[in-house]
From Swiss-Prot:
GO terms for cellular component: cytosolic large ribosomal subunit. Part of the 50S ribosomal subunit. This protein binds to the 23S rRNA, and is important in its secondary structure. It is located near the subunit interface in the base of the L7/L12 stalk, and near the tRNA binding site of the peptidyltransferase center. NCBIfam families: L6_bact. The keyword Transcription regulation does not apply. It comes from Pediococcus pentosaceus (strain ATCC 25745 / CCUG 21536 / LMG 10740 / 183-1w). The lineage of its organism: Bacteria, Bacillati, Bacillota, Bacilli, Lactobacillales. It comes from the Bacteria. Keywords: Ribonucleoprotein, Ribosomal protein, RNA-binding, rRNA-binding. GO terms for biological process: cytoplasmic translation. GO terms for molecular function: rRNA binding; structural constituent of ribosome. This is Large ribosomal subunit protein uL6. Belongs to the universal ribosomal protein uL6 family.
Amino acid sequence: MSRIGRKPVEIPAGVEIKQDGNVVTVKGPKGELTRTMSSDITMSVDGNVVSFDRPNDNNKMRALHGTTRANFNNMVEGVVNGFEKKLELIGVGYRAQLKGKTLILNLGYSNPVEMETPEDLKVEVPDNTHINISGISKQRVGDLAAEIRAVRSPEPYKGKGVRYVGEYVRRKEGKTGK
C-alpha cells in the first residue's frame, strides 16, 4: 500500500467536511475549499478520521491514492492554519511595492513588472525587498510565489534575483583571466 495514502487524516474541531459525489468541500475557521477528487479512490469518514482506499494495486492507483490523501490533508491544514510563502529580492535596485491589488516589481528590466494579485490570497510587502504571500490553498500560494520567482530567478554567479527565504542558491565561480 501507499505509505502516505494509508495514513488517516485527523479532522480537528471546527472543521466540516461535505462530500457530494467526487466533489469534497472542507469548511473551517479560515474559509472554505472545494476540490474534485478522483472517482477511483473512495473516501470514508469515521467520526473525526477520514481514510482513503483504492480498488487495486497498480502503479497509477498507488500514486493517485497518496496524492488524493495529501491534497485532502492540505485542504484541512489550509482551512485551520493557512499557508505562507516568503520571498526576498536580492540585487542592487531590486524592490517591490503593492498598489491596491497590483504588485509592482523593479527587477532590473527596462520597465517595472506589474502583477495582479488574486482575491483569495493575501500579499504583503513589509519592506521593499520582502514579499509575504498567505492563503488557505497551498497550491494557489505556491503557484503565485513560483510565478513571482520566475520573473527573475536567482542566477548562480552573483546570486541576484527573487528567491524564497532560506533558499540556498548554488554559486559558480566566474571566468578567470589569463
